[in-house]
């Protein structure tokens, strides 16, 4: 037998949906593991089934044929070594996971159990330990692996020798070509390089000198600018001095006009005195022209002419004296003013410099004030924009909060509804547990009847003859993924995938949230509303409303067809004691009425022998 591949990979979805036999994958992620080629039909392939949720089964009805070595999560049946028997994968149903029960586990077959053989189970079977065929197959696998490892090592050694030969050839080629390698003479470029370096140094020095000259010129320009500002400030100082002297000149002109007015008034007064004196003289002269001569002996009179002349001289002397005093006062005042102007020149220059500096300071402060005002306006605008933006964001956050509060209220309402539904389901679960207990008691009594009547070995592994029971023994496998609960009775493996409840009867496994099975071999389907089977061999109804029968075929999952997959294939549960159940995401296929496992049972075929049914309890 040749092995084509050894691969193991996990895929999120592979193959068709939770279907029946033949190695089709499921849609909830699968582990594909195959040693060799898979086969859907019967035959002699012992390392054959591909796996996945809905793992492969070999659905031939004939006798003989090898058991499946590869398995699935919830694996299927392969064909046994004798009629109706099937071999388990990795130690039978007691190692099952992701849906034990009848046919569950990593290929948990009808020969399951650590001590089960062909037909091992509740009623015992014929011989066989856990892995007689597995040991043989492991030897073959190890021999194949050893041969492949030896060929791989030979290939590696051959490649290393080829690599050494290539390295040797490369070294020989370099040794032959090494003498022909010559170096070019670049000495005639050295002078050119030196000339270029000298030119670079010269240009660098010139550039630095030009930079220094530019700096000096810039400093000289700054000095001339300062001198220009000083020269521009000097005419301003001279203009201020001229304005001050103009005021002094105006004051002097005012005093001169006052003196002229006084001079005019005194001149008019003098003229008036002369006129009055002349009139008096004329009057006196007229008196002297009369005929009367009066002689009076008096003292000699004063000469009026002389008196007037004296007075005239006195006034003229007074006027000249006043004029000289005024001129001297004017000259002294002008001298003092000129002296003051001469002394206040440096002080005026200092004051003008201070004034110019203060003007510059005022200009700088005005510029800074404008800058601060511009910055203030920009900051106010930015503040307004920020307020508007954050107000918008705050409004959005408030709207989101209101939406979240509405969603929270909705979630709370849904939670209340779910709590009510949970209470209802809990009451249903309690009622179903009571029914399961009743079924268990009935089944125990029926089993005692079978043992006493010698009806044959009732194995949930492979029975002989017409007893094609589903997998499972005293130690029926437990599947415990996705909240599955534990199995119940003698070998009743717990399916328990996706919230499955506990299995009930001799091998009845549950899957996908289904209710409990109720017959000797009837596994429970029953996810999402599936009804439980109630007879000796009646298969349970599948998921999503599969119907139940008393010996007929069970409805499949997802709208149940007659098989186990999505509306799946044909084989439902038979009507015999060992009739396997359809049900969960497609049961694995057995050779004759094997039960569909969890997550991967295929279709089953009806068994050949049937017995009476036990009435279903409500």
From Swiss-Prot:
Region: Coil 1A, residue numbers: 138-173
Protein name in UniProt: Keratin, type I cytoskeletal 9
Self-association and partners: Heterotetramer of two type I and two type II keratins.
Name of the coding gene: Krt9
Assigned GO CC terms: cytoskeleton; keratin filament; perinuclear region of cytoplasm
Ranges where the record places region Disordered: 1-49, 449-618
Region listing for Tail, in residue ranges: 447-609
Family of this protein: Belongs to the intermediate filament family.
Gene Ontology biological process terms, A to Z: epithelial cell differentiation; intermediate filament organization; skin development; spermatogenesis
Region (Coil 1B): 193-284
One Gene Ontology MF term: structural constituent of cytoskeleton
Phosphoserine sites (modified residues): 14, 17
Miscellaneous section: There are two types of cytoskeletal and microfibrillar keratin, I (acidic) and II (neutral to basic) (40-55 and 56-70 kDa, respectively).
KW Coiled coil (keyword) present: yes
Keyword Phosphoprotein: yes
Low complexity compositional bias, start-end: 7-16, 27-49, 607-618
The entry's keywords: Coiled coil, Intermediate filament, Keratin, Phosphoprotein
A Pfam family matched in the record: Filament
Summary of the tissues where the protein is detected: Expressed in the perinuclear ring of spermatid manchettes within testis and in keratinocytes of the suprabasal layer of footpad epidermis (at protein level).
Domain IF rod: from-to ranges: 138-450
Chain residue ranges for the region called Head: 1-137
Region (Linker 12): 285-307
Renumbered residue ranges of the record's region Coil 2: 308-446
Organism encoding this protein: Rattus norvegicus (Rat)
Biased composition (Gly residues): 17-26, 456-603
Functional note: May serve an important special function either in the mature palmar and plantar skin tissue or in the morphogenetic program of the formation of these tissues. Plays a role in keratin filament assembly. May be involved in spermatid nuclear shaping and sperm development.
SMART domains, per database record: Filament (SM01391)
Region listing for Linker 1, in residue ranges: 174-192
């Amino acid at each position: 037998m040749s092995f084509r591949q050894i691969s193991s990979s996990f895929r999120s979805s592979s193959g068709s949906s939770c279907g029946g036999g033949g190695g089709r994958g499921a849609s909830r992620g699968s582990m594909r593991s195959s040693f060799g080629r898979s086969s859907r039909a019967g035959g002699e392939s012992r390392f054959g089934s591909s796996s996945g949720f809905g793992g492969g089964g070999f659905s031939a009805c004939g006798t003989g044929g090898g058991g499946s070595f590869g398995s699935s999560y919830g694996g299927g049946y392969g064909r046994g070594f004798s009629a109706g028997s099937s071999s388990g994968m990795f130690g039978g149903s007691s190692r099952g996971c992701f849906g034990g029960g009848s046919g569950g586990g990593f290929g948990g077959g009808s020969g399951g159990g650590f001590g089960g053989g062909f037909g091992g189970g509740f009623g015992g079977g014929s011989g066989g330990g856990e892995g007689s065929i597995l040991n043989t197959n492991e030897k073959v696998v190890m021999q194949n692996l050893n041969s492949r490892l030896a060929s791989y090592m030979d290939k590696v050694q051959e490649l290393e020798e080829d690599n050494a030969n290539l390295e040797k050839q490369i070294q020989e080629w370099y040794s032959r070509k090494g003498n022909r390698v010559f170096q070019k003479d670049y000495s005639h470029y050295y002078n050119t390089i030196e000339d270029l370096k000298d030119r670079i140094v010269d240009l660098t020095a010139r550039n630095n000198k030009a930079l220094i000259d530019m700096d000096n010129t810039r400093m000289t320009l700054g000095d001339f600018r300062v001198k220009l500002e000083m020269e521009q400030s000097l005419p301003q100082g001279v203009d201020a001095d001229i304005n001050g002297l103009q005021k002094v000149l105006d004051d002097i002109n005012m005093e001169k006009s006052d003196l002229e007015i006084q001079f005019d008034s005194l001149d008019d007064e003098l003229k008036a005195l002369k006129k009055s004196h002349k009139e008096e003289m004329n009057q006196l002269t007229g008196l002297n022209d009369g005929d009367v001569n009066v002689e009076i002996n008096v003292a000699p009179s004063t000469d009026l002419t002389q008196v007037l002349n004296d007075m005239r001289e006195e006034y003229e002397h007074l006027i000249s004296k006043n004029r000289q005093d005024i001129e001297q006062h004017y000259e002294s005042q002008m001298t003092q003013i000129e002296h003051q102007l001469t002394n206040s020149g440096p002080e005026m220059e200092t004051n003008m410099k201070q004034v110019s500096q203060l003007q510059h300071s005022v200009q700088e402060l005005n510029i800074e004030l404008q800058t601060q005002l511009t910055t203030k306006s920009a900051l106010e605008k930015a503040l307004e924009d920020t307020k508007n933006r954050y107000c918008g964001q705050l409004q959005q956050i408030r709207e989101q909060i209101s939406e979240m509060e509405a969603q929270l209220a909705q979630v709370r309402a849904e939670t209340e509804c779910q709590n009510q539904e949970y209470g209802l389901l809990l009451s249903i679960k309690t009622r179903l547990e009571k029914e399961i207990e009743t079924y268990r008691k009935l089944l125990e009594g029926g089993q005692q009847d079978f043992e006493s009547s010698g009806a044959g070995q009732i194995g949930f592994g492979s029975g002989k003859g017409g007893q094609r029971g589903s997998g499972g023994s005293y130690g029926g496998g437990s599947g415990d993924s996705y909240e599955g609960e534990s199995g119940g009775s003698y070998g009743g493996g717990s399916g328990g995938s996706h919230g499955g409840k506990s299995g009930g009867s001799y091998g009845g496994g549950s899957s996908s949230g289904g209710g409990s099975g109720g017959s000797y071999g009837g596994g429970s389907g029953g996810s999402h509303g599936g009804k439980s089977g109630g007879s000796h061999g009646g298969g349970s109804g599948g998921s999503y409303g599969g119907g139940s029968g008393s010996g007929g075929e069970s409805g499949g999952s997802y709208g149940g067809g007659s098989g186990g997959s999505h509306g799946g294939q044909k084989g439902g549960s038979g009507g015999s004691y060992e009739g396997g159940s359809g049900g969960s995401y497609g049961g694995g296929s057995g050779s004759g009425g094997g039960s569909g496992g969890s997550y991967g049972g295929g279709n089953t075929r009806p068994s050949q022998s049937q017995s009476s049914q036990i009435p279903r309890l409500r």
